[in-house]
């Protein structure tokens, strides 16, 4: 495939996209619900509405949906960026400014929104980067996760990069494309550029920048943790996929349905994908949430994220580098869950895996004001923030950005 950021690369026509997707779905053993590509997004939204997902404000995990992973190749200059606007986020506290800006670089351009808390601090603030799932927006994701309220409580900034329909018709982050899985290219480079720009403007503590996401956003968060280990101190992945779990549309569809579940290492990955693939190499603190009734992105993907993280830690710390314990409990909303903690020798959590029993493809403990939320589960947002802010990070004099 040609470099998608080359000025000579034309955009795919809808007919070509349609034919490509049809072949990909057939290869993955799936069947498309839409007859024409231009109607696919509307069809997906209509199908999701009864389950209270996009297009509905009901909060229910009862049904899952198909995530459209179709990608459109775009020239950075072709990206349409709307004018900068401001909106007011109305949370439990007094209204505060929730600003929209845009970022452009040689690798591409994206809009983003960011939240700066009113709470003042004598020290540089931390920052959490939130990557939405398919069909979502920054406003939708902020409402569903309530991350802005947590930012106000703890005094950190929040950045919400937005995928564009020009880059992906369903606004999915292109986690499944090889050029979007590497450093200094594609979407990882654009998101890293946004993060550095906001951090420089607002005096963010460069040791305390974290990234989290849902579904396609979680898969991209995992990629960012691997490709920019010096920029992101930790990762939060909710209903996501492991690093380099796919390299094109057919392998993406297979991975989502559990095609790589239980496979470990580069050799196994190559057998599953039919091609060589990358292996996570950086030991990075990570917290993973996944519902065990998720039929959109199978739970085995969350387990594989944990396995990749464990392998990276073992490579750097030795086989006995982490101590494992498991807890069983129930959330105030009623859902039971299992929490597995992998801690270092000092008892500090480095890898956490939360399995939410009976939950589907939705943000656990989320607000019904946003899509893809399940208010009955443990509060994923609060637990991710707790995990991030409790990390023992290196002092400024040994940190290199």
Positions of PLM-derived features:
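A domain-start/cap signature at the N-terminus of enzymes
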Residues: 1-127, 139-140, 145, 212-216, ...
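Short substrate-entry loop that stabilizes the transition state in hydrolases
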Residues: 119-125, 131-169, 245, 362-363
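The conserved beta1-alpha1 loop
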Residues: 129-135, 239, 290, 357
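Conserved alpha/beta-hydrolase "acid-adjacent" motif
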Residues: 296-301, 364
